[in-house]
Amino acid sequence: YCNENGYYSIYQSDRYGFNNPDEEWNKKEIEYLLVGDSFAHGACVNRPNDIASVLRNLSGKSVLNLGYGGNGPLIEYATLREYLNKNVKKILWIYFTNDPQNLQNEEKKDILINYLNNLTFSQNLKLKQKEINNLALKKIKIEMNEVIKKNSFKYELLKFAKLNQIRKKLLLRAPLPIPKP
């Protein structure tokens, strides 16, 4: 995803794919709920250095993080509508300077506009996690195959550029070292 600190961040997501310890969903009351883009998500840092973990550790309170990289205000609102059915005391919206641009792009998506126009609209995403996981795995496989094809093409192109097969046929090799007397 990103390597801003000299490493790729890795975390075990919760049951819905968010950057939380899964047991946070089992708590009867949530003190802080975070929503936002990659800053809320904890992109580029490992636990316990992401904002939700820091807040959890400093406050000693429950923190649920619904942030995700690339989200803008309308997706964040939809996320709250889909996943917020808990007793939450405080919602912290992590807003960043690129959010107005994200909002302009999101306003073109009919599915997201439904959340604004219809207060009862829901895709019931919490109940469709198996389907969501399958779609994500399918997308990952497609992208991995594209990377393999791309790298395979680069390798073949490099072999051609070095004229490996012609060199083999003509027995053109680097000269052997001269043995010492």
What do these predicted ranges mean?
Residues 1-58, 78, 154, 159-181:
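Membrane/wall-proximal cationic-aromatic binding patches
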Residues 74-181:
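Interaction-surface signature
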Residues 39, 69, 97:
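Catalytic metal-binding/acid-base residues of hydrolase active sites
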Residues 61-62, 87:
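Secondary-structure boundary/capping positions in well-ordered alpha/beta enzyme cores
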